[in-house]
Amino acid sequence: MEIKEISVPQQGVVADYMNGKKEIQSCFDYMLTEDAFKQRVQDLREREFFRQDLVTHLLEYNTKLQAGEATIQNVKALGDENTYVVIAGQQAGLLTGPLYTIHKIISVLQLAKEKEESLGVKVVPVFWIAGEDHDMDEINHTFVTKNKKIKKTIFHDRNPKKASASESELSLEDCRKWIEEIFKTYPETNFTKDVLQFVDDSLRKSNTYVDFFGHLIMKMFVNSGLILVDSHHPELRKLEVPFFKQIVSKYKEVQEGLHNQQEVIKELGYKPIIETKSNAVHIFMEIDNERVLLEDNQGKFVGKDGTYSFSYEELIEEMERSPERFSNNVVTRPLMQEYVFPTLAFIGGPGELAYWSELQQVFHTIGFRMPPVVPRITITYIERDIATDLHDLQLQERDPFLNNVDKLRENWLSNQIEEPIDDRFVEAKKEIMNIHTSLQQFVKEIDPGLSAFAGKNEFKINEQIELLERMLKRNVEKKHEVELNKFRRIQFALRPLGAPQERVWNVCYYLNQFGLDFVDRVMEKPFSWNGKHHVIKL
């Protein structure tokens, strides 16, 4: 593996944040400097955490996932007041979801290791699985290449239930068939059998989406020391009850903090991402197997436009009795993470970084400071045949990231012809239209009754010219079919559906191509935190 860095243009909050723009950096409590991380350690030492209860839960949960010894030791280390975490989170995508989930975990592992060395304190890596998520459409699919097209392959469970990812039971037989169909789209390699066995081992131990995700991730990173947490685990929810109560008692201040910070964001020229009602309580409650967002209505906590209603006392009582019924929304999830974990740094993608910039005053309302927010490492893999295609087309490795691949293809094709087809036909149509306009005027003067027919005649001529243009383009493309297929392969591999590779393709393809130690070998590479994109030649 060979790694290179390229500068890829970014936009909005992320671009300005990484470029050191002071205005947007002022929306975060810490700069990404070594002094800031030292200050963060000092700030965390002044706070109290329920470390022992957390350790007890995490030991039980990670042991069930068959965690390696390094993970168990890291969990135990969390009981020490001088241990901190680097954390990131994601939904429980089937087969681990898009590649960026893996890249988030790699980011967490690398930053935890670096900060432990530079700060001289114990830093452990934590990955937060968003188990409370009810949106199965976000996690029930993956993308494959089939018949020279990119296809979204959805897992249709025969017994779908309206439940969270932590509670949604998987039909193992259905899921196994779905996985086999996906692997049929991959080339048969020396690794295929082992990878299928690797995946099936995790599936057999799983009852839910979160189980399957957790087993796969733990198996993939078994020697890394990674700690997993299911955000919707009933035992974790019990530990979170005091903070749920605090949110309920301060929901108006939370909403005001969000509103005020979003006004700051607007004044800086950015468009806020988080959308909430002014009476939002920012907590979900599970009612009749449905996740219902609570709102304030004249001192009552209501859901579904008043279908459900609770007094403050009733809500607190229910939190104490059934904490597993409650979960956070986009505003309070980061707060709960801050309450539970002594967070040295949070690692997020571009979207997360943007919405965290709207939360500064929300954190302050609760009496917290936002942890340092570090943009995750971004990676694209270039396989040998794709590198050959780039070379054959005289393209640089950075070209597909800086330019639209379709545009690169069009430019290449036009360079194969002395005069661009589009330009020549536009010119021809213009000349013919001028001639025909004059001809129509002549016809009208002699026989006005033929004016309509003359107009149709012009339309027919245009149709024939466009047909000729299409046929010419088709023949030119056929002549250069070999080269144009190279562009298609580049597009599919590096910019599928016009998106970054890591937002579409799944890690199983690469495990199948390069072996079960693929992720371990990627983790051996030195990644930088300078905001540049990492390209790995395989």
UniProtKB/Swiss-Prot annotation:
KW Ligase (keyword) present: yes
Keyword Coiled coil assigned to the entry: answer is yes
Q: Which residues form a coiled coil?
A: 460-484
Q: Which GO terms describe its molecular function?
A: ligase activity
Q: What class of enzyme is it?
A: ligase
Superkingdom is Bacteria
- Under which EC number(s) is this enzyme classified? 6.-.-.-
Q: Which InterPro entries match?
A: Bacillithiol_biosynth_BshC, CC_BshC, Rossmann-like_BshC
Name the keywords, alphabetized.
Coiled coil, Ligase
Q: What does this protein do?
A: Involved in bacillithiol (BSH) biosynthesis. May catalyze the last step of the pathway, the addition of cysteine to glucosamine malate (GlcN-Mal) to generate BSH.
Report the sequence similarity comment from the record: Belongs to the BshC family.
Q: By what name is this protein known?
A: Putative cysteine ligase BshC
